[in-house]
Amino acid sequence: MFARLAILLYAIVSYAAFTVSFLYALGFVGNYVVPKSIDVGSPTNLGEAILVNLLLMSLFAIQHSVMARPAFKRWWAKFLPLACQRSTYVLLSSLILLLLFWQWRPIPTPVWQTSGIAAWLLIGVHWLGWLIAFASTHMIDHFDLFGLRQAFVAFRGTEISGQSFRTPLLYKIVRHPLMLGFLLAFWATPAMTAGHLLFALANTAYILVALQFEERDLIAEFGATYQDYRRRVPMLVPRLFARRRTDDRKSPRPVGAPR
């Protein structure tokens, strides 16, 4: 009983760390409220700023991707109970994000500056991105994604069941709405600086690469079900018009049209 309670408390602490890092990320990326943001901080030379910022983002990318791979999960399952594995992943990710926010070096050189309607539109898209990202976690299983469900199930002494494949709401429009939301939040800004551009470019590159590994894992887990989903639903960019399916019925071919 004590071990199960400790795992539950650990999961709650981990979720609290995630909440702090997520809320700070809103201010960090958008330059709102927080004392140190993507464009606000102590000045430093350009070379140091680029190097430190890339190292910080690389640290997050390596931890986030390596710990998500099935081979790593099999390895650390030898040492860590299943009920607290996700919480550990979330806690380490959150702490690295907080380190990034703390040690980030601003590069304030302006890239673009907008005003008026254009600025308000970009601010709107920015917040829409955060809303999409947050809502996407609740469309699947928010508490499973951040480790609380596993801890509560273990606390009750029941078996942790696997998740079935579902495509609710935004997942019918794009396969990875969470990542789409992040991209919108990172890129949509009325005042883009060189530091913000570096952040957006590096994270976009990471997301595009990481999704290839995630898709491979999903195919391995769900097989033909996910393959069919990939054929029907785009990865990140929604289709403006739904493509007509020709598998079941074909449109009549005009006379003289090539076979």
From Swiss-Prot:
Which regions span the lipid bilayer?
5-25, 46-66, 88-108, 115-135, 182-202
Q: Which keywords describe this protein according to UniProt?
A: Membrane, Methyltransferase, S-adenosyl-L-methionine, Transferase, Transmembrane, Transmembrane helix
Protein localization: Membrane
Q: Which molecular function GO terms apply here?
A: methyltransferase activity
- What reaction does this catalyse? methanethiol + S-adenosyl-L-methionine = dimethyl sulfide + S-adenosyl-L-homocysteine + H(+)
Q: How does it sit in the membrane?
A: Multi-pass membrane protein
An example Pfam family from this entry, by short name, is: NnrU
Q: Which GO terms describe its biological process?
A: methylation
Which InterPro entries does this one have?
MddA (IPR054700), NnrU_dom (IPR009915), Nurim-like (IPR033580)
> Would the keyword Cytoplasm be found if you checked this record's keyword annotation?
no
What domain of life is recorded for the organism? Answer: Bacteria
Q: In terms of one coarse class, where is the protein primarily found?
A: membrane
Q: Does the keyword Signal apply?
A: no
Leading EC class: transferase
Q: What is its EC number?
A: 2.1.1.334
Give the CC-aspect GO terms: membrane
What is this protein's function per UniProt?
Catalyzes the methylation of methanethiol (MeSH) to yield dimethylsulphide (DMS).
Q: Which family does it belong to?
A: Belongs to the nurim family.
Q: What is this protein called?
A: Methanethiol S-methyltransferase 2
Source organism per UniProt: Bradyrhizobium diazoefficiens (strain JCM 10833 / BCRC 13528 / IAM 13628 / NBRC 14792 / USDA 110)
| Gene symbol of the encoding locus | mddA2
